[in-house]
Amino acid sequence: MTDARGTPLGAATDAAGVSETMLGPAALADIPPCVALPPMVPVVADRAYDSDPLRGHLAGRGFRLLSPHRRGRVRPATNDGRRMRRYRRRYVVERTFAWLHGYRRVVTRFERMAELHHGFVHLALAFICLNRLL
């Protein structure tokens, strides 16, 4: 989870087989309470996050999910073109992932314990935040 400039706010890690929609609420819960977010902040995500339960969970926490709909969507579309213009700024999140992949220990998971890997991810994100500040 990043802000509009690409500064990391929170992260969630899990096994490779877990759906990304399950990690979204965990990444939001990882944002520290000292970060002041305005109400109804848009969360820009890719097509994998398009699920109605996740939209409901985010709306309950004061966020609005902006993601393109999946092709086989059964329910009617909830996005319009005006709000989806913000999806163009998705490159900011992808750029933060590229910065994170600059840390070899995070890219290849050498640790067997999930807590250690999660700690190294947070350490790499802290270094990214320091580089953004300096």
Model segments located where?
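Active-site beta-loop-alpha junctions of metal-dependent nucleic acid enzymes
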Residues: A12-V35
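Short, acidic, Ser/Thr-enriched surface-loop or helix-capping motifs
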Residues: D3
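Charged phosphate-binding loop/patch that engages nucleotide di/tri-phosphates or the phosphate backbone
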Residues: F120-L134
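Helix-centered, glycine/charged polyanion-binding patches within enzymatic domains
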Residues: G17, P33, L37-M113
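Catalytic-loop motifs flanking and including active-site residues across diverse enzymes
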Residues: E20-L23, V92, G119-H122
